Amino acid sequence: MKYIDIFELSRAKTEEKGHLTIDDLPDLKEMLKSETPKADIHWKATGTGLRRRLASALLTIDAKLTTDCARCGKSLEIEIVKEVPFLFTKTEDEANRLPIEEDGDDEIVVGSTKFDVAHWVEEELILSLDLFPADEDCEPDPESLQSQDEEEIPERVNPFAGLADLMKKNS
């Protein structure tokens, strides 16, 4: 685990970078539906001084993730390249007091002098994933589309079928 002082990074306008694998990111590993999920992630956090009177940084991620295609079940490599600007508050209350319309493109996060980089990167990757990752040009596996329980659906009975007979009896 790598921890950084996010406020010092911002103030000094320095840069931290590193590499993460799937074993560093347990929540992402659970989300990648595969027997052997993989992740090769390079990240860089660059302090950008104060913006809107708050500590700020730019997180750059270059990741290659391997999971299974939701349609055909074959191995699927997903590439995620993104830059996300962040503003850091010192408390949750301070973050909640910021007007929503002033967020702009910046993500607002509660910072720390012991900020968990792996969790930060993992959260951004999870937000970038499709719910059902799939190849753009694959065909669905017909067997996976078949219902596991091919039980016959019982014929529905019309609830009003006996209404006419009931009305005749009561008249």
Language model region names:
Residues 1-13, 87-171:
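Charge-rich, low-complexity linker and terminal segments
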Residues 18, 47-49, 73, 104, ...:
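Residue-identity detector for glycine
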Residues 68-71:
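The −1 position to Zn-ligating cysteines in a subset of zinc-ribbon hairpins
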Residues 76:
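Cys/His-rich microdomains that often coordinate metals
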Residues 1-66:
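A positional/architectural concept
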Residues 79-82:
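Short Cys/His-rich "knuckle" micro-motifs
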